[in-house]
Amino acid sequence: MLITLLTIFHHTSSAQRDPQLREALSTMTKASISGDIEGILSQTSPRIIESMGGIEQATKVTKELYSSLIKYGVKIDSMINYVDMDISKIDGIAYCFIPQVLVMSMPEKDKMAITSANLLALKEDDTKKWTFFNFNKMNQEMINMFLPEFNGKISLPPDLEKKTLVVGKEEVAKTVDHLMKLIDESVKKHH
C-alpha cells in the first residue's frame, strides 16, 4: 500500500497545482485499485456513463469487467499517474491528458503485467468537478463523437506502444521507471 501511495504522488507538476484535480485523480486511482465500482463511476465523465446507457448499465458493465479480471487471476496492483501535463480549456471545458502506467498481479505469482493507459480529465462548466474519460481504445473519431467541442481543436497525444509487458516481480520498478521515462520523452517531444 505504501508503495502505491509513493508512486501515485511520485511526480509533481501543473496538474498538481489544481488541488481539485489531484484529489479527483487520487479518488479515481484508489477506486480503480480496490475495484470500487461506485467510486470509479462517481469519477467517470457523465458523457461516458450516458453513452453506456445510464448509470445502471454502466455499473453492470464495469462490474463485469472487474469480475472477468478476477476470474483470470488479474488484479490492478498500482497505477502510476504521469501528472506533468498542462491544463487547457476549450468552450468552457477544462481538460488535461494523464498518461498512466498500470501494474497488475497475475495468476503466476512471480510475474506482474505492466501496461500503459491514457486518461482524459475533464471539468465542464455545468458539472464544476473533474471527471475522467479513459480513451485507451478510442480513436480521434470516437473522441470527436463524445466531445464534439474538441473536434478539429485537439488531437490525441501520441500513444506509447500498446503492449502489455509481463515481467518478474523483481523487474517491476525498473520497467515502470522505463515506461515513465518513455512517457516523459513523448510528452516533451510533442509540446
Residue spans of the language-model regions?
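Hydrophobic, Leu/Ile/Phe/Ala-enriched alpha-helical segments that form helix-helix packing faces
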Residues: 32, 65-69, 102, 121
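Short, aromatic-enriched amphipathic alpha-helices that serve as compact interaction elements
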Residues: 19-35
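Generic anion/oxyanion-binding catalytic loop in active/binding sites
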Residues: 4, 29, 47
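Bacterial Sec-dependent N-terminal signal peptides
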Residues: 1-19
